[in-house]
């Protein structure tokens, strides 16, 4: 689960981190009032969406007058912002931040942290190249990224933060400020089950103070049950509608950009199914794992979610019956096809528990379903059907 910038800043501020002050506005009148509250001379206005690249997409603007504020608010609020991190539809802009103008600054740094699966530790990253996409820095000048792995038994140590501060070229009081910021960030990360944390830029102002100008926070969704305050910050309008619907039925669904819908039981088999579709020249439209304990109702809903994607031109159902019986899956497929007006080819591959009975039910249903005898056969048939 992602947080908006204003939510992330409010959370980090609770841990004593210095953040750029800003006021949330949902319309032009509120934006003007916020502008005046901040002095009425200069302010930075930022669209609140769960995506990076807002500046290049027109989602950030410096306002020097009320007219600038009104124009930006009216043009951006209740529209959709398309950035390099969104799909073609973009993300809905329901609000903006009117923030204090902290420029000019002396330097812009970067500070971030992730859960590194290879080291199985929280890993901090810092760079002197703040204010730009960190992915670009990592690709072009990886030597400019400083990494620190944190031992979970002892936590982040002050000496580690000081070493990063020295590497960033900070001096005197700035070192102490940075140590406090990095330690507070680690505390916030652990206590709120962050999956991702990013301050870009972390600005060094002309008076020497260090300030978090932007904040990006992602929360581990599996931990939300124990984080009621954080869970209440969830903005469902920023999430894919199909993924949101899938979560209500405990379905693991991720929307992709292809045209072949996939329904599989088991994450590994789902990945293999997408791979073999690509191998035969197709493009998967989604990842969908109905799980080992799939019920008839969940399978029907999964079918509906797949077909709700208008780009889907064919569906591959790949079920290996273990805990899930293939005859139950077959009954669910028949019910779903009868309930939903299916106009695209559907290829079904059933193996394992009651596979023969499942295949018999499908054959006797009278529906136009394409049977497959193996994974390769299924992929070849669905790709051919889509291209026909």
Swiss-Prot record:
EC number annotated for this UniProt entry: 6.2.1.5
Positions of substrate binding: 265, 322-324
GO biological process: succinyl-CoA metabolic process; tricarboxylic acid cycle
Enzyme class, first EC level, given as a word: ligase
One cellular component (GO) term of this entry: cytosol
The reaction(s) this protein catalyses: succinate + ATP + CoA = succinyl-CoA + ADP + phosphate; GTP + succinate + CoA = succinyl-CoA + GDP + phosphate
Residues engaged in binding ATP: 46, 53-55, 100, 103, 108
CC cofactor: Mg(2+)
Pathway: Carbohydrate metabolism; tricarboxylic acid cycle; succinate from succinyl-CoA (ligase route): step 1/1
A Pfam family assignment: ATP-grasp_2
Binding site for Mg(2+): 200, 214
Domain ATP-grasp as annotated: residue spans: 9-245
Cofactor: how and how many bound: Binds 1 Mg(2+) ion per subunit.
Highest taxon of source: Bacteria
Quaternary structure annotation from Swiss-Prot or TrEMBL: Heterotetramer of two alpha and two beta subunits.
Function, in words: Succinyl-CoA synthetase functions in the citric acid cycle (TCA), coupling the hydrolysis of succinyl-CoA to the synthesis of either ATP or GTP and thus represents the only step of substrate-level phosphorylation in the TCA. The beta subunit provides nucleotide specificity of the enzyme and binds the substrate succinate, while the binding sites for coenzyme A and phosphate are found in the alpha subunit.
Family label: Belongs to the succinate/malate CoA ligase beta subunit family.
The name this protein goes by in its record: Succinate--CoA ligase [ADP-forming] subunit beta
Gene: sucC
């Amino acid at each position: 689960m992602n947080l908006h910038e204003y939510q992330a800043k409010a959370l980090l501020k609770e841990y004593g981190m210095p953040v750029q002050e800003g006021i949330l506005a949902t319309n032009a009148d509120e934006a003007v009032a916020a502008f005046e509250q901040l002095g009425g001379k200069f302010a930075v206005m930022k669209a609140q969406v769960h995506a990076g690249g807002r500046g290049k997409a027109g989602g950030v603007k410096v306002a020097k007058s009320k007219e600038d504020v009104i124009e930006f608010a009216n043009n951006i609020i209740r529209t959709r912002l398309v950035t390099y991190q969104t799909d073609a539809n973009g993300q809905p802009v329901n609000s903006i931040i009117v923030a204090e103008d902290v420029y000019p600054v002396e330097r812009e740094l970067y500070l971030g942290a992730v859960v590194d699966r290879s080291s199985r530790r929280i890993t901090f990253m810092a760079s002197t190249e703040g204010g730009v996409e960190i992915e670009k820095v990592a690709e072009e000048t990886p030597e400019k990224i400083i990494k620190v792995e944190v031992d979970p038994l002892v936590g982040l140590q002050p000496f580690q933060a000081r070493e990063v501060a020295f590497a960033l070229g900070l001096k005197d009081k700035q070192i102490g400020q940075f140590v406090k910021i990095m330690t507070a960030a680690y505390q916030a990360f652990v206590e709120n089950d962050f999956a991702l944390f990013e301050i870009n830029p972390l600005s060094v102002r002309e008076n020497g103070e260090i300030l978090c100008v932007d904040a990006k926070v992602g929360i581990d969704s599996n931990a939300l049950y124990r984080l009621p305050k954080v869970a209440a910050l969830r903005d469902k309008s920023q999430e894919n509608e199909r993924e949101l619907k899938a979560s209500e039925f405990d379905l693991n669904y991720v929307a992709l950009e292809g045209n072949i819908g996939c329904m599989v039981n088991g994450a590994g088999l789902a990945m293999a199914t997408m791979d073999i579709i690509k191998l035969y020249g197709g493009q998967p439209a989604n990842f969908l794992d109905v799980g080992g304990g799939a019920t008839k109702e969940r399978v029907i809903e999964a079918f509906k979610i797949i077909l709700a994607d208008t780009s889907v031109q064919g569906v591959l159902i790949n079920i290996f019956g273990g805990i899930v019986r293939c005859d139950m899956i077959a009954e669910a497929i028949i019910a779903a096809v009868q309930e939903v007006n299916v106009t695209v080819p559907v290829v079904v591959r059933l193996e394992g528990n009651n596979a023969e009975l499942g295949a018999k039910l499908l054959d006797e249903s009278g529906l136009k379903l394409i049977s497959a005898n193996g994974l390769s056969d299924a992929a070849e048939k669905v790709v051919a059907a889509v291209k026909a």
